[in-house]
């Protein structure tokens, strides 16, 4: 009789796990409380995998050895509460997939910057000729890559929801880009619980491994000081200079380890903002620890185009710059976006609030924002936060309307910045849909 795994959710993570499990000889059952997409149904049918949609049948799960929970399913969902009584281990996709590869894993997590850092790291390693794949929250699922390929290195973008359900998973190089309040709706508003989840990137690391962390983040630094780890700690910081630190000096990224000091010139680096410099420092340090030359690192960074929906320049129309930062779904991401603005800015903000505290933005809004355009079904919290410090504040209910209003307000050489600070699912399918609608509305001006 085959060992059985039940997979909750038939999205990218669920289908990837189903593919890998089937290939490894497991009996697989996929259950999704929502409607399963046609492409996912075709994939599962092609593999001969039993599935169900719009329900969860507990009786079909009782004989499973493992439950793989897709990251989008909250821990408090009724099905997970029901499964507790069965005492079946619940694991994440990255936990399951890591059982079937001996590759070197680079795990990148954080509240902001993890996608850009993962993409930079992948580009540098790929440019250096490494046999590497980019997976996790970006690109294909990790499980699908393990099922279909045998790469020697994986750069994984990892969310806290995936780290919540690991047991033996470990990264040879773990990276934490920063920790700020985000997804607190999934952690009962408890920042310490969210922080604890992110710190699990260090779990199971040994003395041959490395934990890279943002030394400019005081909350993260305190958390790192409190962990008991055998891994080598290495911070990247725009402020500090020590051994086992990556820092900035004379327009260069300086990587100091116990053995060597390496300098990488950042002149002409295309991505702007302190946050992108920190992302580049993290990616450069990963590459350096894997013996990539500083010349290759610099060349890769100079040719890095940036991730979509992250301070993405769209168009300049009548000398007004339109910038798509739809991925900025929390206050910290918006802070870095506003910090990088060098001209008066019309700021489009709003969506589904995730427990935001906007006070950290007040100095930047006073200094850089000439008008705020609210885009969401419920904008009251944003209005209450910024009306006292903003001369112009307007509400809109569609992206097209928001962009048209922004065009009327903006003057020559101003910026129009979409940086929502909120989730997208009140008016849009996801942040990509929101960003794409912004770009389309700008093109139609």
Task: List where the protein language model places each region.
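N-terminal leader/targeting and accessory segments in enzymes
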Residues: 1-92, 96, 384, 394
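Nucleotide phosphate-binding/pyrophosphate-handling subdomain across enzymes
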Residues: 4, 16-24, 263-370
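Residues in the short beta-alpha loop(s) of Rossmann-like NAD(P)-binding domains
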Residues: 11, 34, 138, 216-217, ...
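Residue-level detector of alpha-helix initiation sites
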Residues: 12, 74, 112-116, 277, ...
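Phosphate-binding loop of NTP-binding sites
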Residues: 20-23, 58-62, 71-215, 219-231, ...
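Short internal beta-strands
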Residues: 27-33, 211-215, 348-349, 368-377
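C-terminal helical cap/extension that packs against the catalytic core
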Residues: 41-42, 359-414
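Beta-strand->loop->alpha-helix junctions that form or flank phosphate-binding loops
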Residues: 52-55, 91-95, 228-248, 298-302, ...
């Amino acid at each position: 009789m085959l060992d059985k795994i039940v997979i909750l959710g038939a999205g990218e993570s669920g289908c990837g796990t189903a593919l890998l499990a089937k290939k490894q000889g497991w009996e697989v059952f996929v259950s999704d409380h929502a409607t399963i997409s046609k492409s996912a149904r075709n994939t599962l049918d092609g593999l001969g995998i039993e599935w169900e949609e719009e329900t969860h049948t507990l009786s079909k799960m009782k004989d499973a050895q493992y439950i793989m929970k897709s990251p989008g399913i909250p821990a408090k969902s009724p099905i997970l509460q029901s499964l507790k009584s069965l005492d079946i281990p619940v694991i994440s996709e990255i936990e399951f997939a890591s059982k079937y590869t001996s590759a070197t894993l680079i795990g990148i997590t954080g509240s902001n910057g993890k996608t850009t850092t993962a993409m930079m790291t992948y580009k540098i390693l790929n440019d250096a000729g490494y046999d590497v794949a980019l997976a996790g929250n970006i690109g294909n699922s990790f499980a699908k890559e393990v099922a279909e390929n045998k790469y020697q290195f994986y750069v994984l973008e990892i969310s806290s929801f995936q780290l919540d359900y690991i047991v033996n998973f470990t990264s040879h190089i773990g990276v934490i880009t920063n920790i700020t309040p985000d997804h607190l709706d999934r952690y009962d508003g408890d920042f310490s619980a969210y922080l604890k989840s992110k710190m699990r990137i260090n779990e199971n690391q040994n003395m041959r491994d490395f934990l890279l962390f943002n030394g400019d983040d005081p909350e993260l630094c305190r958390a790192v000081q409190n962990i008991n780890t055998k891994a080598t700690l290495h911070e990247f910081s725009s402020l500090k200079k020590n051994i086992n630190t990556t820092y900035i000096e004379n327009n260069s990224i300086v990587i100091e380890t116990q053995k060597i000091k390496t300098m990488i010139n950042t002149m002409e680096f295309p991505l702007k903002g302190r946050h992108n410099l920190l992302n580049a420092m993290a990616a450069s340090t990963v590459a350096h620890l894997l013996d990539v030359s500083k010349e290759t690192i610099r060349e890769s960074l100079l040719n890095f185009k940036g991730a979509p929906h992250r301070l993405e320049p769209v168009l300049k129309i009548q000398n007004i710059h339109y910038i798509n930062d739809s991925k900025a779904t929390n206050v910290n991401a918006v802070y870095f976006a506003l910090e990088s603005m060098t001209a008066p800015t019309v700021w489009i903000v709003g969506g589904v609030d995730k427990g935001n505290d906007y006070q950290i933005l007040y100095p930047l809004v006073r200094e850089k924002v000439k008008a705020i355009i609210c885009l969401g079904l419920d904008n009251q919290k944003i209005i209450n936060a910024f009306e006292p410090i903003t001369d112009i504040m307007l509400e809109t209910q569609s992206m097209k309307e928001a962009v048209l209003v922004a065009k009327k307000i903006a003057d020559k050489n101003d910026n129009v910045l979409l940086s929502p600070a909120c989730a997208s699912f009140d008016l849009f399918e996801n942040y990509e849909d929101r960003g794409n609608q912004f770009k389309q509305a700008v093109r139609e001006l």
